[in-house]
Amino acid sequence: MKKIIILGGGGFIGGHLGKRLMDDGCHVRIADIKNHEFWDHSEICHEFIKCDLTDPKSVELVISENCDELYQLAADMGGAGYIFTGENDANVMHNSALINLNVAKECFVKKVKKVFYSSSACMYPEHNQLDPDNPNCIESSAYPANPDSEYGWEKLFSERLFLAFNRNYKLNTRIARFHNIFGPQGTWDG
């Protein structure tokens, strides 16, 4: 049985991912600072650890040495109503960067077999996203960097962090840039 850890599993994407992986027969551990708003823990994971991933000791506790796959979805995100006002930029950048610094280091230390980092299309330059019918969101358009928000800058930084751990320490990392994810069990406020 695959051993999976989902960081940020109390959120929209993490809850759906946990449910799917449990249905596929995986053992799922979720860590988040909050409970899932819509699902009971037993519906999305075998183990739920409520903790603050900005704390390195919490990350050390959550990430086990026998982890087959780790999905890093955790961020100080709080929903679109939180990240795009500009009022929370310092917290978004500081807290999310701390989470990712802690996670990358601990994944290397514990020799996690595969790491998935959830980035965002917000890391693309703002001018690439102005035409909603034809966003220029391809790899060659990512630089020169000019993300549309501090959230986007932090996502870009953390992409570079995980890629550096992949390059320097052989941390098997995959990255996806999500764009406007919504659906059942989603929330505007996070």
Question: Language-model segments: which ranges?
Answer:
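Rossmann-fold NAD(P)-dependent oxidoreductase module
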Residues: H16, R20, E106, L161
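NAD(P)H-binding glycine-rich loop region in Rossmannoid oxidoreductase-like domains
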Residues: L53-N95, E106
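SDR active-site strand-loop-helix element
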Residues: L7, A31, L70-D76, V115-A121, ...
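Active-site Tyr-X1-5-Lys
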Residues: E126, N146-R174
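Flexible, glycine-rich beta-alpha linker
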Residues: M123-P125, S149-E150, L171-G190
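Conserved Rossmann-fold NAD(P)-dependent oxidoreductase catalytic core, especially the SDR/UDP-sugar
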Residues: L101-D148
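Glycine-rich NAD(P)-binding loop of the Rossmann-fold in SDR/ketoreductase-type enzymes
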Residues: E69, N91-N102, K110, S149, ...
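N-terminal Rossmann/SDR dinucleotide-binding element
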Residues: M1-E69
